[in-house]
């Protein structure tokens, strides 16, 4: 029997160098960018209620999330959860490297850097209590595609991986679908028998169909066992009702959202430099496609135009599958991670199909005469530089968001200290007194001071001034960060008080009349005095 060291040495001989590069580059770049957040306890508004949460989200269709998040315990411990999340993401980088057949270590580093720097990861870090589970879901989604590509019956194992991925977080279904589409496109581009290509395409389709059927079956069984139904949260109760008018009614929203987020979402690019980098990457991709089209005489084939049309019509839908699954969803940035694949695909496509004849020319004239080699070289260089610029820009954006999240915490802490002092100093207060409170911080008394809105506007959970939106947020913050246990009334009870004359006439905190006791209940008014 081999010793542990001998086993490790034997395993090490099986690991490809580019896998090590992908894994280590993801970890190193990830720690350099995200360590400030992972070493801090800076929750967002959802994090306040998730200091300990078993992640049993079966009613949201996430039947595997409780297991996926269980490795790090159910406590919100950013450093441990963050490390596990980065390890799973590094695994995704390795799978992508093998899936895309990346050999060039520079390209491997660029792909890994884009994956770990993209602001959707920072947005997920803001919801750190689910970070490790979500990154495991992404790993499984990517692995499902690789299994189909590598093995004849890999679509079966891939279907299982896809089912568990969707059972952890439905948003990463788009991640798998886009990768499948790209693999099919590469299949069509490269040499081979059409019958063989068709069989491989069918395997990708089978993986998706079987995987989703398995997901629904497991979900139905677990809901029945637990005696629960799908919740209305994020429109999940309508999941699967996409036939007929339901699907057609969402098509417009899908295309509008795709175009608006891509062009004006302030995430893919948010300044001149990142805008130019995305433009350069797009131009490199287009030029490479045009060269391949001319060289392969694709422009003479009707199938070429059919494929282009299908891609133009299908990719926005594939990217926004969450809008079909949950049409009423609040589309958080952490649900938009799949957009990074377009950047990764551009880098891969250029390096794969433009870099095969890379030669060096003596001068510009020779470069013009020898378009084959030098154009390839310029395309590879331009795409690489653009990717580096984007990685750096995303790193800056991530840390701007982290800085604002920390300031949100500090502002919330200062606000709650003042409010708690007022509550405890109000005549009639005693420990356990029922407190009636809406929770929103009024902008009349506390004007917005967030200066990062231009960059964090679409990063839900990391933008704004305060962590407080509901009475439950106040209760959790004061309990976990101020050590105060307060008895807030349920929202249903608060509804009647909110419309009472006594409450309407109160000042907004920190007004003199913003906290008082009425009939044994403490009224606390924090929202604007004047209602719209």
What residues fall within each predicted segment?
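Intrinsically disordered, polar/acidic, low-complexity terminal segments
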Residues: 2-59, 63, 69-91, 99-112, ...
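Juxtamembrane "helix-exit" motif on the non-cytosolic side of transmembrane helices
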Residues: 37-44, 117-127, 188, 216-225, ...
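Membrane-interface micro-motifs in multi-pass membrane enzymes
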Residues: 58, 62, 85-88, 106-149, ...
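Hydrophobic, aromatic-rich transmembrane alpha-helices
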Residues: 93, 263, 267-302
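Membrane-interface transmembrane helices that cradle and orient dolichyl/undecaprenyl
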Residues: 141-155, 187-192
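Membrane-interface alpha helices of multi-pass inner-membrane proteins
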Residues: 154-170, 175-181
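Perimembrane helix-loop-helix junctions
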Residues: 175-209
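Aromatic-rich transmembrane-lumenal/periplasmic boundary elements in polytopic membrane proteins
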Residues: 211-242
């Amino acid at each position: 029997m081999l010793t542990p060291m001998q086993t490790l040495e034997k395993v090490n001989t099986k690991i490809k160098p580019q896998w090590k590069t992908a894994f280590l580059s993801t970890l190193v770049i990830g720690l350099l960018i995200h360590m400030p957040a992972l070493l801090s306890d800076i929750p967002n508004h959802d994090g306040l209620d998730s200091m300990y949460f078993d992640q049993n989200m079966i009613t949201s269709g996430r039947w595997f999330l409780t297991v996926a998040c269980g490795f790090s315990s159910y406590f919100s411990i950013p450093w441990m959860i963050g490390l596990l999340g980065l390890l799973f993401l590094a695994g995704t980088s390795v799978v992508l490297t093998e899936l895309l057949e990346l050999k060039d270590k520079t390209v491997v580093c660029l792909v890994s850097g884009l994956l770990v720097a993209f602001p959707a990861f920072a947005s997920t870090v803001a919801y750190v209590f689910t970070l490790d589970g979500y990154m495991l879901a992404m790993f499984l989604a990517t692995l499902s595609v690789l299994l189909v590509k590598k093995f004849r019956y890999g679509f079966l194992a891939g279907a299982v991986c896809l089912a568990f991925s969707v059972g952890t977080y439905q948003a990463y279904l788009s991640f798998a679908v886009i990768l499948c589409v790209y693999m099919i496109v590469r299949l069509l581009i490269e040499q081979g028998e059409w019958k063989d290509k068709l069989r491989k395409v069918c395997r990708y389709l089978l993986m998706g169909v079987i995987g989703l059927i398995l997901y629904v079956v497991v979900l139905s069984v677990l809901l029945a066992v637990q005696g629960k139904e799908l919740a209305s949260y994020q429109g999940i109760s309508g999941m699967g009702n996409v036939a007929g008018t339901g699907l057609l009614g969402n098509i417009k929203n899908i295309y509008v959202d795709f175009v608006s987020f891509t062009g004006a979402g302030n995430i893919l690019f948010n300044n001149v430099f990142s805008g130019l980098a995305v433009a350069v990457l797009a131009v490199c991709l287009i030029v490479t496609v045009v060269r391949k089209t001319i060289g392969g005489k694709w422009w003479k084939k009707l199938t070429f135009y059919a494929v282009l049309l299908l891609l133009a019509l299908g990719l926005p839908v594939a990217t926004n599958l969450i809008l079909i699954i949950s049409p009423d969803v609040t589309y958080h940035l952490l649900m938009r991670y799949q957009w990074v694949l377009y950047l990764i695909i551009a880098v891969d496509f250029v390096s794969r199909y433009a870099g095969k004849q890379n030669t060096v020319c003596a001068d510009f004239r020779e470069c013009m005469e020898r378009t084959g080699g030098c154009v390839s070289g310029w395309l590879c260089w331009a795409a690489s530089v653009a990717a580096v610029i984007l990685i750096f820009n995303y790193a800056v954006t991530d840390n701007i968001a982290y800085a604002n999240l920390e300031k949100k915490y500090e502002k919330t802490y200062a606000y709650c200290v003042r409010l708690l002092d007022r509550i405890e100093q109000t005549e009639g207060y005693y420990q356990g007194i029922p407190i009636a409170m809406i929770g929103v911080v009024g902008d009349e008394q506390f004007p917005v001071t967030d200066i990062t809105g231009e960059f964090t506007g679409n990063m839900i959970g990391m933008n704004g001034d305060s962590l407080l939106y509901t009475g439950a947020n106040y209760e959790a913050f004061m309990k976990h960060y101020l050590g105060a246990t307060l008895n807030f009334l349920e929202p249903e009870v608060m509804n009647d008080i909110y419309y009472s004359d006594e409450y309407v006439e109160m000042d907004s905190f920190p007004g003199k009349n913003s906290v008082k006791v009425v009939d044994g209940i403490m009224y606390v008014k924090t929202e604007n005095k004047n209602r719209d």
